[in-house]
Amino acid sequence: FTKSKLTVLEINPQVINIAKHFFRLPKESSRFKIIEGDGINYIASTDCKYDLFLSDAFEEYGLPETFCTLTYFESCKKILSDDGIFVINLWGSDPKTPIYINRIMDVFNQQVFYVQSDKPGNIIVFGFNYLLPSLKESAVKKKLKLLERKFNLKLMLYFNRLIKNSSIHPSDNALFNKE
């Protein structure tokens, strides 16, 4: 990712300081920019297009309601490139989470999947600004096994977790085709 550019938005200066001091947040550069300010205002006013937009906006008591509105999701879609991806971290125990997922599905024309952690907690939702391809499950597994050997990673373990804990199920999802 040597050509990647990263912009981070954070409204709380204390969070930025903690990240710098305890999480080795890199210094700003031509490829890495930190904006201290309101993310919603930034999204509404920017002309930039992003290939990937991550939203992780928790407060002391959970996700602020303004980051779960149809307007917010539409604004996020608007700043994506044609092949951009929106990712949001939701809280699984919030009774409104299914409503938020449905809003994201509406905004992204059903081109969405989500992954739940093994234990109740976070739900990561992916919204795609393009039509998802239809994949053959066996071809995906074959490629993952090759990559496992090449990189000494347990990719099949993660693939199986993804299938188990996500909205993607090869047997009934358009993302996967059985042979």
Segments predicted by a language model, with ranges:
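The AdoMet/dcAdoMet-binding core of the Class I SAM-like
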Residues: 1-82
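SAM/dcSAM-binding transferase cores
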Residues: 123-179
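C-terminal substrate-binding/active-site "lid" region of AdoMet-derived donor-dependent transferases
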Residues: 70-134
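Generic domain-boundary/flexible-linker signal
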Residues: 17, 64, 97, 135-138
